[in-house]
Curated annotation (Swiss-Prot):
It comes from the Bacteria. PROSITE patterns: MPN, UPF0758. Belongs to the UPF0758 family. This is UPF0758 protein VC_1786. Keywords: Hydrolase, Metal-binding, Metalloprotease, Protease, Zinc. InterPro entries: MPN, RadC_JAB, UPF0758, UPF0758_CS.
């Protein structure tokens, strides 16, 4: 057990680490809401590793961005099992329109730690990109988080 100094109770090591990552993500989120952008992959992966690391099941999330690539909202849309999460383009599109997003960045974690995207990851990314393009919402990247991270944009897959 680890004592978390800001709070007066004991947490397991995993809970402690998750809490620290959440607090780091909140600090980064405030930076991006105030005007910094997600135009650089390094900014994106730094933020997403804090948000998605440490889960024992897959999480698919979306960063909804304005025209200047500033954060409107980060939202975990789908939760899955240890090695898969079902993703529904209709729900992603609905959320993007609801917050009036001009662009999005997709993200999900691989609890195994291996960030290498699967063929299923590549297929759903293309389906999402096709659906969002119908309403002029740009897909800037899809980042897979494990022990490190992989950017679809950096690999030229978008």
């Amino acid at each position: 057990m680890t004592h978390f100094p800001r709070h007066r109770y004991l947490l397991s090591q995993r809970a402690y680490e998750h809490r620290v990552l959440e607090e780091a993500a909140e600090i980064l989120e405030q930076r991006y809401v105030r005007g910094e952008t997600f135009a650089r992959t390094e900014n994106t992966t730094e933020y997403l590793r804090c948000k998605l690391a440490g889960y024992e099941h897959e999480i698919f999330a979306v960063l909804f961005l304005d025209n200047q690539h500033r954060l409107i909202e980060f939202k975990e849309l789908f939760r899955g099992t240890v090695d898969a999460a079902s993703v529904y383009p209709r729900e992603v599109l609905k959320e993007a329109l609801n917050v009036n997003a001009a662009a999005v960045i997709f993200a999900h974690n691989h609890p195994s730690g291996d960030p290498e995207p699967s063929q299923a990851d590549r297929r759903i990314t293309q389906r999402l990109k096709d659906a969002l393009s119908l309403v002029d919402i740009r897909v800037l990247d899809h980042v897979v988080v494990g022990k490190s991270s992989v950017s679809f944009a950096e690999r030229g897959w978008l």
